[in-house]
Amino acid sequence: MSSLRDFQARHDLSMEALCARILERHAATIRVKKPAVAIANLARIVETTLTLANRKGFHSTSLRDLTEQSGLSMGALYAYFDSKDTLLMMILGQVVGVVEEVLGRPPDGLANDPAGRLRWLLRTHLFLTETMHPWFVFAYMEAKSFPKEGRDLAVTSEMMTEGMIADALADGVTRGLFAVPEVTMAAALIKPMLQDWYVKRAKHRRRGITPDLYAEQLIAFVEAAVGLRRT
């Protein structure tokens, strides 16, 4: 995988595909039994929620706002979730699930290649957040108002991502490829540079920076920072 286009061809992260996974995860509580109907309405609900949250904040968004913008009745909404907190956890849970699914499966050929694995992690994380941009902005911007369960899930996901980066760094140090005195701290410093892409994407776009260019520049910067020894 060398480009955003390659990544998107490999992973179906369309709104419909993501909502199909939400339906699968919450099938026991969603009361709509026809999958096609349920997925279509979930897509309307989630897309409207992400749009409203970006405009006025999730905390300030009411279910009435959601009914007006989605075109679904209050009763229809309650067929999918019983409260705003449940809706929030459905969205956040999908973000966390995709992160684990996509980043947790590096190519087998990188098992003994920590430098390649680090590049893959950085590039894949960036392409993932670009593809699911509204979802990640929602998770980042709304974190302060999450209920405890949501905050715990968000922190666990962030620590998981940092752990993957730290593991690649530690492997590289062991093999004499990286010069990093503290891999956990290094991973914690790298993570905000990944987040900067989706939190401040408009700034980068104004500068003409594409996702592929940002990925290449970020990788070059990180490799220099960790003292990659070219073999």
Protein language model regions, located:
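Amphipathic C-terminal alpha-helical segment
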Residues: 127-131, 167, 171, 187-209, ...
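Short, amphipathic alpha-helix enriched in basic
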Residues: 31-32, 38-65
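Amphipathic alpha-helical packing segments from all-alpha helical-bundle domains
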Residues: 94-104, 128, 149-175, 184-188, ...
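Hydrophobic alpha-helical connector segments
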Residues: 105-134, 187-190, 215
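An amphipathic alpha-helix adjacent to DNA-recognition modules
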Residues: 43-47, 59, 80-104, 162
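N-terminal intrinsically disordered/low-complexity leader segments
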Residues: 1-38, 231
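Amphipathic alpha-helical segments used for helix-helix packing
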Residues: 19, 130-149, 203
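Helix-turn-helix
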Residues: 52-86
